[in-house]
Amino acid sequence: MKRIGLLGGTFDPPHIGHLLLAQEAIHCADLDEVWFVPVGIPPHKEREEIASNDDRLAMIKRAIKGKETLFNICTIELEREGKSYTIDTVRTLTKKHPDVRFFFIIGGDMVKSLPTWKGIDELLATVTFIGFKRPGVLLDSPYQDQLMLVEGPEVNVSSTMIRERMTEGKPISYLLPLDVERYIYEKGLYKTNESRKSPSVSKTSSN
């Protein structure tokens, strides 16, 4: 049976933290693939607060370029109208792919919020949650015995941080793949400072 991890999020924008989580999940849970699942309208946000579906999808494609044998994109939530709930996505995917064992990848901060998730008991019975925790940090959750808890690399990077740095005119290089960074500047996302130039590969000269 194929083992596929689901990594949901707004990916606004996708960054190195997302890629590291996906890579570590493949290693720790012996996954065949990780599917990035960009949400349409997340339950806790409004539509105008996030970049368009087309822009976020384009950035994910650039982020996983060259790694398509391990990373893929599932657009099921972008195609669904209204707010996106994980339980609806899992129900659809398990029905469509009965020969796949699904894992759902979450960060340590989300482990604590699991009791508030819609249909959490059904989710726990249907998929295996992979919860990443920071080294030395104890997680307090009534469901922690039902999760696969692993210690992953600690990367203090978030999409919010990147957007804020953009609005402040600060560099975002090395926080996300170069192709994603270029796309952000080319499309003028996140109120980019027009005086800043899009990153480019510097040319080296021989002496």
Swiss-Prot record:
| UniProt pathway | Cofactor biosynthesis; NAD(+) biosynthesis; deamido-NAD(+) from nicotinate D-ribonucleotide: step 1/1
Lineage: superkingdom? Bacteria
> Which Gene3D superfamilies is this protein grouped with?
HUPs
| A Gene Ontology biological process term | NAD biosynthetic process
Keyword Nucleotidyltransferase in record: yes
| GO MF entries | ATP binding; nicotinate-nucleotide adenylyltransferase activity
Similarity field = Belongs to the NadD family.
Return the protein name: Probable nicotinate-nucleotide adenylyltransferase
* Gene for this chain: nadD
